[in-house]
Every structure is written in structure tokens, then in C-alpha cells.
């Protein structure tokens, strides 16, 4: 299916739902920097596969905003697709929210998948659109037309031993409860995957280059509940959670569970997805501020610092081995940036404790 055909299907859905415009952000429900192919809605609808960019679609226009790193890529991938683009921050690029406001009539309606939209972005867009009484509504339309969507694959969750973390999950949860008490909140809903992994000392491989797993975490003064795919948790993980007094519930039960919260004071990051706010805001008082987990994990304990030191030494050994190999082989075999990157990966993988790279190698044009 071509991009133009996909846009035509989407516009039919927009018309059927009374929408004058539709916004697709590059995000998953946890606002992860990297995410699984299942959530690549912007990539699917536009055929633009960079890591940055979002698209605004009306009945007669589709415009994508991205940054200067992807100028050449945008030209190559979007030309002739029916999707125009702007490079943010350049003199010819309008502010995206203002562009949408100018394109729409008084009282128009804009659709967006709230599950993949951070709350702060939703609020800012709503404030701009309010100038013309334009409303933004939750409308997950992509799922209606993306028929061959990839499966949302999950991998086994595992425990990160305390000899690496330097602090137990029990102590971390206790510290968060102290913060909650000082702030006067009764519930803390943790939505960022790295935050969930840090608090629980659990890791996974659901997202390439990121040792995390898809999950939410709810903390109250009496209870901590991890919402994760049950089949990802073997008996050892279940026993570990029980040891640290963390209840395990299915990932897909999260919204049903939080819909029962009533009359409470809830702490949420402004980066949490708008669907969570839509669920809890009507019946509770919601406080939005930077997750206290971000602040806690920014201060490394001595065990973590020692881990950094050891990692740097191991990486230094890998680099030394790589340079020795290069010195012996340069001029004897054909070498490209890509092939050198694979060789460097091999030397790093030889080091004890290697789990994988933190991002894909960045290779120059034509490798």
C-alpha cells in the first residue's frame, strides 16, 4: 500500500468520525525514545522512518515536522508521497501548532491517539487550538486501517542483581513512599519504562538497544503493583517480586485498575500519556511534575559508580584489541565503516558482562 493510499484511508476514517485534522506523533504509550515496531504509527502512515518527527493531516494536506539531521532523508522518502515537510527551527518553517490553527475553521475538531501523546504536548496543543474553539479528542484511527501491523513481541523479564544496582527494590520503593508522603499524594503511577526498571531492579529486552520491558508501576503507601505481561515473568521473577512485596498484575489490566481510583491524590509525570490523564483526572486530584525517580536515579551510588569505572576499563580493552587488529589488517582486507563497526562489536562482546550496544552504529553515507 502506498503512502497516498494510506492517507486516503485515514481521511475516510477522519470524515466518518467528524474530524477535520489528525495528528500522529512518533511515540509509544510510555514515551520511550526507542519503541517496538508495533507503535511506529508515524512511520507507517508517512513512510518516513527517522527517529524524530510528527505529522499533521487535514483533508487536503499532510505536513511533517522533523529536525535538520533528517533533511536529506525527508527529501528522499517523502517526495511524491503526498506528505510535505518542514525542518524545525529554520526560517521557512512555521510553528506546527500555529500552522494547524491557521488551516482549520472555527470550532473544528482534531483527532489524536491519546495513548501515544504525552500529556504536556496535549495540553499545549489544546491551548493553541482553543483560540478558535477547536477541540482535540482521543481517536486511535491508525489501528483501524493498519491491517498488517507487527506483533507486539515481548521477551523474558530478568532480575538485575543488587551487586550491580547497589540498592534493593524494597529500599527504592520506601524512598519513593517518603517522597509521596511529603508531597501529600496517595498514588504514584510510574509510566516510563526506564523508571519502572530502575525501581524494580528488573530488566528485559522488549525494545532493541534498551534493557527494559513494557510495564507500568503503581505505588501507594500500602501497596506496589507491577503491570507486566504475565508470560514474561517466570517463577524466579515472581518469587523475587513477592520477596519485595510487589504485586504482579497483567499489563492489559492497568487502565481497568486505575479507573477504579476515586477521590485520591495522584502523582504523574507530565510526560505520561494522555489516556492515563483521561482515565484518572475526572475523579481524582492529579499533580504533574517531573518524576521523583528521575531525580533519585540521577545520583549514583558507589556500586553504580564502580560499575561505570569497570565498564570503561572493559571498553578500553575492547578498543585496544580493535586498534591492534586494525593496525595488522589495514590495507590487506577491504574495510568500510560498517564492517569496522561489526568488528568493534565483536571485540566488545568478548568482554565479560556484555549485554549489547546502547544504540545502532552510526555509519557515514554508503558505509
Label every PLM stretch briefly.
Residues 16, 220-222, 281-286, 332, ...:
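Secondary-structure transition/capping motifs at alpha-helix termini
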Residues 3-7, 90, 114-122, 166-170, ...:
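Generic detection of long, well-ordered alpha-helical segments
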Residues 124-151, 273-307:
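Terminal amphipathic helices with adjacent charged low-complexity linkers/tails
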Residues 100-101, 108, 112, 237-300, ...:
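Conserved catalytic alpha/beta cores of large enzymes that bind or transform nucleotide phosphates
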Residues 2-105, 117, 121-260, 351, ...:
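N-terminal accessory/capping or targeting/presequence segment of soluble
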Residues 111-118, 164-165, 195, 292-296, ...:
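Conserved short loop/turn motifs at secondary-structure junctions
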Amino acid at each position: 500500500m502506498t503512502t497516498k493510499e494510506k492517507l486516503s484511508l485515514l481521511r475516510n476514517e477522519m470524515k466518518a468520525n467528524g474530524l477535520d485534522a489528525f495528528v500522529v506523533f512518533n511515540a509509544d504509550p510510555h514515551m520511550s525514545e526507542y519503541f517496538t515496531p508495533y507503535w511506529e504509527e508515524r512511520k507507517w502512515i508517512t513512510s518516513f522512518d527517522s527517529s524524530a518527527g510528527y505529522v499533521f493531516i487535514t483533508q487536503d494536506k499532510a505536513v511533517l515536522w522533523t529536525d535538520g539531521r533528517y533533511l536529506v532523508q525527508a527529501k528522499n522518502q517523502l517526495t511524491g508521497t503526498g506528505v510535505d515537510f518542514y525542518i524545525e527551527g529554520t526560517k521557512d518553517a512555521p510553528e506546527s501548532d500555529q500552522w494547524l490553527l491557521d488551516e482549520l475553521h472555527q470550532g473544528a475538531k482534531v483527532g489524536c491517539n491519546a495513548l501515544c501523546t504525552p500529556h504536556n504536548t496535549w495540553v499545549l496543543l489544546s491551548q493553541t487550538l482553543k483560540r478558535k474553539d477547536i477541540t482535540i479528542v482521543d481517536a486511535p484511527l491508525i489501528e483501524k486501517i493498519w491491517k498488517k501491523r507487527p506483533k507486539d513481541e515481548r521477551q523474558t523479564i530478568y532480575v538485575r542483581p543488587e551487586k550491580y544496582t547497589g540498592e534493593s527494590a524494597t529500599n527504592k520503593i520506601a524512598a519513593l513512599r517518603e517522597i509521596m508522603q511529603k508531597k501529600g499524594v496517595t498514588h504514584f503511577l510510574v509510566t516510563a519504562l526506564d523508571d519502572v526498571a530502575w525501581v524494580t531492579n528488573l530488566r528485559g529486552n522488549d525494545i532493541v538497544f534498551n534493557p527494559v520491558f513494557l510495564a507500568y508501576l503503581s505505588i501507594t503507601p500500602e501497596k506496589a503493583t507491577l503491570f507486566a505481561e504475565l508470560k514474561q515473568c517466570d517463577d524466579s521473577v515472581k518469587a523475587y517480586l513477592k520477596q519485595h512485596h510487589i504485586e504482579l498484575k497483567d499489563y492489559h489490566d492497568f487502565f481497568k485498575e486505575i479507573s477504579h481510583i476515586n477521590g485520591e491524590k495522584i502523582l504523574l509525570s507530565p510526560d505520561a500519556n494522555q489516556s492515563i490523564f483521561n482515565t484518572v483526572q475526572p475523579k481524582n486530584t492529579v499533580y504533574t511534575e517531573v518524576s521523583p525517580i528521575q531525580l533519585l536515579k540521577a545520583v549514583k551510588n558507589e556500586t553504580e559508580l564502580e560499575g561505570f569505572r569497570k565498564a570503561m576499563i572493559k571498553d578500553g580493552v575492547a578498543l585496544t584489541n580493535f586498534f591492534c587488529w586494525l593496525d595488522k589488517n589495514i590495507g590487506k582486507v577491504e574495510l568500510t565503516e560498517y564492517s569496522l563497526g561489526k568488528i568493534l562489536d565483536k571485540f566488545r562482546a568478548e568482554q565479560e558482562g556484555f549485554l549489547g550496544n546502547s544504540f545502532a552504529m552510526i555509519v557515514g553515507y554508503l558505509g
